[in-house]
Amino acid sequence: MLHKKEMRTTSNQKYEITEISHEKYPFLHRIRALRDVSAEVRAGDLGGFVESESNLSFEPDDTAWIFDDAIACNDAYVDKGAVLRGEAVVCDNTYISMGAVLSGHTRAEDNAYIRGAVLSASARASGFSMILNDKDTMGVPILSGHCAVYGKVSGDVRLTGSALVISGEEIRNDTLDTLVISGKNRSVIRDSSRDELAPQQPAPSPPKKQKGCEMSR
């Protein structure tokens, strides 16, 4: 029998690991919020499953959460507002961060790193894959269908169907367009405003030198 006091460190005031074990994997247990975590998670709400506190951040201001029957186990770690929903699974040495959302039957395994991306349906990240949002363009990778990523995907990229990114391959979109990859087909979605012309913005004038401020030689 597991005791709650043995399942929570004194510094974790965000959630506790309950005695409710997973039906198939009894080494996993549901979490319960000890305080209001976000607008969606209130004190007393049950969450998904973890193996230990090492799977989900309990930093005071971190809204990262595991919902429904989702699982985080082994050395997988979820933090910085990322959430798992449905029956999503993150395991092995994966790192899910920066508001990433995994739902449906998605799976992140091996050494996958997912930052700010959205995965749904049966999308999978394996190997040393990296699926990253673009901090400059604010582009977010969106994966769905049965797509699988073993390489690197970044920016506004939509992978769907049976799209496959193999190990060593990089799909990078650092533009304002949306790159769509469905199976072996590739296309681009452009906003009509991208085709409009605008006058060049004048360069800022250099600051004027003030008298008496020049350095003597």
List PLM regions with ranges:
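Terminal amphipathic alpha-helical/low-complexity segments used for targeting or macromolecular assembly
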Residues: 1-63, 69, 87, 93, ...
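Structural signal for interior beta-strand "rungs" in well-ordered beta-sheet cores
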Residues: 55-195
